[in-house]
A protein has these predicted regions:
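Charge-dense, helix-prone N-terminal extensions
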Residues: 1-123
Length: 123
């Protein structure tokens, strides 16, 4: 009777490394936008932890729940990158508020809006 070998442990990267590797693998212009989004999110919501969520960059709260994410247009063959917020994001505003944004370019104006949204979402 032969012994079954123990399953090999799965080697995983830490969240930050996994997110950076995923962004680095994106084609341009998604890669540049992803790098910029990552920097904005890290600067404005340092308490959120980067991780992969459905293979795309995401940022989770202390309970491990994804607050916000972005995905490249290539993921779903769309014409824009998406920045999205989950129910854990503190964006409630009356009875209706946006939870996803299409991004085709990042200028200083969009970066300022994103920074404010990220701060509010993580508050």
């Amino acid at each position: 009777m032969s012994k079954k070998s123990a399953p090999k442990p799965i080697k995983t990267k830490d969240g930050e490394s996994a997110v950076l590797a995923t962004i680095a693998a994106m084609p341009e212009p998604s890669r540049a936008m992803g790098q910029r989004l990552h920097a904005i999110i890290k600067a404005n919501a340092p308490a959120l932890s980067p991780k992969l969520w459905y293979g795309m960059p995401a940022y989770a709260n202390k309970d491990g729940k994804v607050v916000l994410f972005f995905r490249s247009e290539e993921k779903f063959k769309e014409r824009y990158m998406t920045l999205g917020f989950n129910p854990e994001a503190n964006l409630d505003e009356g009875h209706m508020w946006p939870v996803a944004f299409a991004l085709t370019e990042l200028t200083a104006t969009e970066e300022a809006k994103i920074a404010a949204l990220v701060r509010k979402a993580a508050s």
